[in-house]
A protein has these predicted regions:
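Terminal low-complexity tails and localization/encapsulation signals of metabolic enzymes
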Residues: 30, 261-279
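Glycine- (often His-adjacent) and acidic-residue-rich active-site loop
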Residues: 75, 83-114, 160
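CoA-thioester-processing core
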Residues: 111-117, 125, 131-184, 198, ...
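C-terminal long alpha-helix characteristic of the crotonase
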Residues: 145-150, 178, 201-244, 254, ...
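Conserved CoA-thioester-binding segment of acyl-CoA-metabolizing enzymes
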Residues: 14, 21-84
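Acidic, divalent-metal-coordinating active-site segment for phosphoryl/phosphodiester hydrolysis
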Residues: 188-194
Length: 279
């Protein structure tokens, strides 16, 4: 199992093979992103306990680079985004965003788009507050599982900020125009039950059950065909112009033959196709 600390930048010198407690003892209060890879699942943890895991400017900048590295890691078949402790992410740490509002928004949009473009399945595991930029990140994931007691809000109207068009479209695609307007116009928080009813989250778990369910579900994800998942992700996200590309990928892979053989043999399939690296 590998754990990394990501501050202003991603550096291989930060790769650690220590439990989280050891990482915390090295840099006890500095906001950063942690990540670990275990059983083919990359888990990215937002850590800023002094500000309820609000994202600093350095963390926004670091996230796209981290995601790029994980996307190119053949050991990674799925990604979980979560917050340390009892909070997912309380948005942006405004005290670290000293440039213009446009510059701050650009950092968040770049991170959001990098997460949305991650070529493997992504899941947000949400406890506590998921507000502002936290909701922006969660919405950019493919799936969202929340613990009872989680609260969700989109709060730019409280700051006089124009919410990005890309984030607005993504929110509307999840909850529909009426609920998106409710959230954007008011900045009010909604509970996990309403988030589930409106489509903002996919599952709500009782207290103490979120980790178990996420582990259980990601185990399913990593056992499935990456070819099927990658094509379905593109099509579901609106890229319907690549039918022939994915047909060629299917013809060149052995996933379909393996899936059929495994079904007939009553065994678990061993799919070989993997997402190509950017290099």
């Amino acid at each position: 199992m590998t754990r990394s600390v990501v501050g202003p930048f991603l550096s291989r010198s930060h790769l650690l093979r220590e439990p989280f407690g050891r990482v915390d003892s090295i840099r006890p209060m500095e906001p950063h992103l942690l990540h670990r890879v275990h059983d083919s699942v990359a888990t990215v943890v937002v850590r800023h306990p002094a500000k309820r895991n609000a994202m600093t400017a350095a963390m926004w900048r670091a996230l796209p680079e981290l995601l790029g590295a994980l996307a190119d890691d053949p050991a990674v078949r799925a990604l979980v985004l979560t917050g340390e402790g009892a909070t997912f992410c309380a948005g942006a740490d405004i005290s670290t965003l000293r440039g213009s509002a446009e510059e701050a928004q650009l950092l968040a949009v770049r991170a959001e788009e990098a997460l949305a473009a991650f070529p493997k399945p992504t899941l947000a595991a949400i406890r506590g507050h998921c507000v502002g930029g936290g909701t922006q990140l969660a919405a950019a994931c493919d799936l969202r599982f929340a613990e009872e007691g989680a609260l969700f809000g989109v709060t730019p109207a409280k700051l006089g900020v124009v919410y990005p068009a890309s984030a607005t479209r993504r929110l509307v695609s999840l909850v529909g125009p009426a609920t998106a307007k409710y959230l954007l116009f008011s900045g009010e928080l909604i509970d996990a039950g309403r988030a589930l009813r409106t489509g903002l989250v996919d599952e709500v778990l009782p207290g103490g059950e979120l980790d178990r369910r996420v582990t259980e579900f990601t185990r399913v994800l990593v056992s499935r065909s990456q070819l099927t998942q990658a094509a379905a992700k593109e099509f579901a996200d609106g890229r319907t112009d690549r039918d022939e590309h994915w047909a060629a990928q299917a013809r060149g892979s052995g996933d379909t033959a393996e899936g059929v053989a495994a079904f007939l043999d009553r065994r678990q399939p061993r799919f070989d196709w993997s997402v190509p690296t950017s290099g």
